[in-house]
A protein has these predicted regions:
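Conserved pre-ATP/AMP-binding loop-to-beta segment of ANL
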Residues: 24, 39-42, 172-190, 197, ...
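AMP-binding/adenylate-forming catalytic core of the ANL superfamily
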Residues: 114-121, 131-133, 276, 387, ...
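Structural core segment of the AMP-binding/adenylate-forming
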Residues: 75, 105-167, 482-484
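Conserved AMP-binding/adenylation subdomain of ANL enzymes
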Residues: 209-226, 234-275, 289
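N-lobe entry segment of adenylate-forming
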Residues: 1-57, 61-76, 150, 155, ...
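Conserved AMP-binding/adenylate-forming core of the ANL superfamily
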Residues: 23, 43-98, 115-120, 167, ...
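Gly/Ser/Thr-rich phosphate-binding loop
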Residues: 248, 273-278, 287-350, 363
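Conserved AMP-binding A3 loop
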Residues: 55-60, 186-210
Length: 535
């Protein structure tokens, strides 16, 4: 084991707490355990923007709906089948997630924003036997997209519209539920695509349930907490960390149909929200919302952030609200998702510059990506993690699995960081995003943090592009705050006061928005293609 008091100069190896047990449990068992402990507790709120239309379920009622959903699924599919869910956030999403878990059916989570071609890839690659879909999403006819895809999908036996779901559940006949093991595949989650085509990560019941439990413990979640969830349910943060975190700690899961900053603030006030997990861009929009100071947000005690770099300036702004504490985590879909996290009472003197220490029962090391050797503390390298929460592998992709998971079970994340003397990680960016200019390694995160501290800057992404003389040069894409203006010359001079000359971008582009994944990560490959004029 590697102690929390490791001194500088030691290898970049750190274990999370090993005295915390791994629960050998399937998601359905976690649901039943919650009902045993808090049967009348409020478990779920369907947070319609119109307060009078909000619907609430206790833990006992949640189990009842989940069981009926399981019966509905088993009337059409067998345990072990893969069934896709192509839908925005709604209460039925939660019922189907838990129902599939009880039925031993693997849920394939699908982003409702996918094109017809992208949908066909996910359904085909996952070998989905069925798809449950939202009929119309943001003006797009998803029913037609499913119909168009079906002829090329021989494994797809059934397609169910969500507007039929409640009636099907109401008519469901009791069925025997199978024994589901902790190491069964609960979900196939397709990676967010920051580097290109997504792959299907196979996530187990044990991994999803324990990662959510470890996260909830790290942030100090307690029974009665009210979790306001802006994250998409097809993402591990939404259906894993929040859904299963609140479930296992006796919290209330408040689920709006989509992220809207004004609605989030209204829900925090009216539902007496205590916890919000979001990506940084969501919190920025909430803090920028007019009238935030007039809201009673006195119960909001935790804003937990992940999925994208967290600028220190954002932490300062958020905590200036009053009692609110910010926590920061790091992970990826392949690890269910969190690997490290800070805590509300973190003793680290500069915790806001880190993503914390490993979660319980999680080992982390930082390696030289070329040699595989563990680097000394303070040296940048690739983050690797090993835990019960790491994926089984990529579905039907042994080559990609072998690249991501080594023979000793370490997940190679592709993310760069250094580990300090306390075992905390400081993220430097993606391995593929590292820029080499004239032989010097440059990490975009450092430059982005400096630019984000400029009062006119709302968002920034720095990439490297080919250059004959230097090998690569820096290009900075900048999004300005509403009502603010600045120039590339001014920003360049601003950088020169805080960065070495070779780290200062020479090329600039002002943008209205960034291409992003559904989890809020900037797709730098798309920015690079845009700059180079390639499709």
């Amino acid at each position: 084991m590697h102690s929390a008091t490791d001194l500088p100069g030691r290898p970049s190896l750190q274990d999370g707490a090993m005295d915390v047990p791994v629960h050998e449990i399937a998601i359905g068992e976690a649901l039943r355990a919650a009902v045993d402990r808090w049967p009348a507790g409020q478990a779920l709120v369907s947070a319609d923007p119109v307060p009078a239309l909000r619907v609430r379920w206790t833990f006992s009622e949640l189990l009842r709906y989940a069981e009926r959903s399981a019966w509905t699924l088993l009337a059409r599919f067998r345990p072990g089948d893969h069934v896709a869910l192509w839908s925005p956030n709604c209460a039925q999403w939660v019922f189907i997630e838990l129902g599939a878990a009880l039925a031993g059916i693997t849920l394939v989570t699908v982003n409702p924003g996918l094109t017809s071609g992208e949908l066909a890839h996910v359904l085909g690659q996952s070998r989905a036997r069925g798809v449950i879909f939202w009929p119309v999403y943001r003006g797009r006819d998803l029913a037609s997209a499913v119909a168009q895809a079906r002829p090329a999908l021989p494994d797809l036996r059934d397609a169910i519209s969500m507007d039929e779901w409640d009636a099907l559940v109401a008519d469901a006949q009791p069925a025997s539920l199978p024994r589901v093991r902790p190491d069964d595949i609960a979900q196939i989650q397709y990676t967010s695509g920051t580097t290109g085509f997504p792959k299907g990560a196979e996530l187990t019941h044990r991994g999803l349930a324990n990662d959510a439990r470890f996260y909830a413990a790290a942030i100090g979640a307690v029974p009665g907490d009210v979790w306001i969830n802006p994250m998409p349910m097809f993402h591990t943060a939404g259906c894993g960390l929040v859904t299963l975190g609140a479930l296992q700690t006796g919290g209330t899961h408040v689920l709006p149909p989509a992220f809207d900053p004004a609605l989030m603030l209204e829900l925090l006030e009216s539902e007496r929200g205590t916890i919000v997990l979001s990506v940084p861009t969501m919190l920025i929009r909430m803090l920028d919302e007019p009238g935030i100071r007039q809201r009673d947000l006195s119960t909001w005690r935790l804003a937990t952030l992940g999925g994208a770099p967290v600028p220190p300036e954002l932490v300062r702004r958020a905590q200036a609200l009053g009692p609110l504490k910010v926590c920061i985590g790091f992970g990826q879909t392949e690890s269910s998702p969190y690997i490290t996290h800070t805590t509300p009472a973190d003793p680290h003197p500069e915790w806001w510059l880190t993503v914390g220490r490993p979660l319980p029962r999680t080992a982390v090391k930082v390696i030289d990506p070329d040699t595989g050797a563990v680097v000394p503390r303070g040296v940048v390298g690739e983050i690797c993690a090993r835990s019960c929460c790491v994926m089984r592998g990529y579905h039907l992709d042994p080559e990609a699995t072998a690249r991501a998971l080594d023979a000793d079970g370490w997940l190679h994340t592709g993310d760069l960081a250094s580990m300090d003397e306390y075992g905390y990680l400081r993220i430097q960016g993606r391995l593929k995003d590292m820029i080499i200019r004239g032989g010097e390694n440059i990490y975009p995160r450092e430059i982005e943090d400096v630019l984000f501290s400029h009062p006119a800057v709302a968002g920034v992404a720095v990439i490297g592009v080919p250059d004959v003389e230097w090998g690569e040069v820096l290009v900075s894409f900048v999004q300005l705050r509403a009502g603010n203006s600045t120039t590339s010359r001014e920003l360049e001079e601003f950088c020169r006061t805080q960065l070495a000359s070779y780290k200062v971008p020479r090329q600039w582009q002002f943008v209205e928005s960034f291409p992003q994944t559904a989890s809020g990560k900037v797709q730098k490959f798309a920015l690079r293609a845009q700059w180079l004029g390639t499709p």
